[in-house]
Amino acid sequence: MSIQEIRHPLIRHKLGLMRRADISTKNFRELAQEVGALLTYEATKDLPLETYDIEGWCGTVSVEKIAGKKITVVPILRAGIGMLEGVLSLIPGAKVSAVGVARNEETLQAHTYLEKLVPEIDERLAMIIDPMLATGSSMVATIDLLKKAGCKDIRAMVLVAAPEGIAAVEQAHPDVIIYTASIDQKLNEHGYIIPGLGDAGDKIFGTKQKDA
């Protein structure tokens, strides 16, 4: 597995704003979309291109377009939805495959409760999105599911990653590349990333009054 920490100044700036304890739901949601878009730029920079001709204002012009596999974006519900709009702003033609994964707060293990994959997903590049890579159990479960469906080219984008989660994915799926805005320090005893962002799902959806 390859972990790519994207330290672009715009990403560092926006991530710093997201770490504020008093950030509003609106601002957190907007920043999650913006950082998601910036990560998408990095995660797709090696996509193959092909040349074709069009009629321009001055005659025939050779231009380029993305070639090869089509893309499906795979948000891990629910928090992954918070990055989806930003990702689709750059690749609007991508199909969306939703995967629902819940984590047991006592055991920190994940179980899949929803699987809505696009047809012929085995012929697509699958790009998983989830704000937090904490224990790695949700990410591993999602990759397991995608590989079972026949996916061979899988990438993941997360806002923040813990070393423990990175290690878990690397052990289970060394072929998957992860793009992240930050590799943070560690997990606490409750499985939350330190310093992290808090509960990204609650902050995106406004389900806790203190984050509203």
UniProtKB/Swiss-Prot annotation:
Documented activity regulation: Allosterically activated by GTP.
CDD domains associated with the record: PRTases_typeI (cd06223)
Cofactor(s) recorded in Swiss-Prot or TrEMBL: Mg(2+)
A Pfam family per the record: UPRTase
Co-factor binding details: Binds 1 Mg(2+) ion per subunit. The magnesium is bound as Mg-PRPP.
Residues noted as binding 5-phospho-alpha-D-ribose 1-diphosphate in the record, renumbered to the chain: R78, R103, D130, P131, M132, L133, A134, T135, G136, S137, S138, D199
Gene Ontology terms describing biological process: UMP salvage; uracil salvage
This protein's UniProt keywords: Allosteric enzyme, Glycosyltransferase, GTP-binding, Magnesium, Nucleotide-binding, Transferase
Pathway(s) the chain acts in: Pyrimidine metabolism; UMP biosynthesis via salvage pathway; UMP from uracil: step 1/1
Identification of the protein by name: Uracil phosphoribosyltransferase
Gene expressing this chain: upp
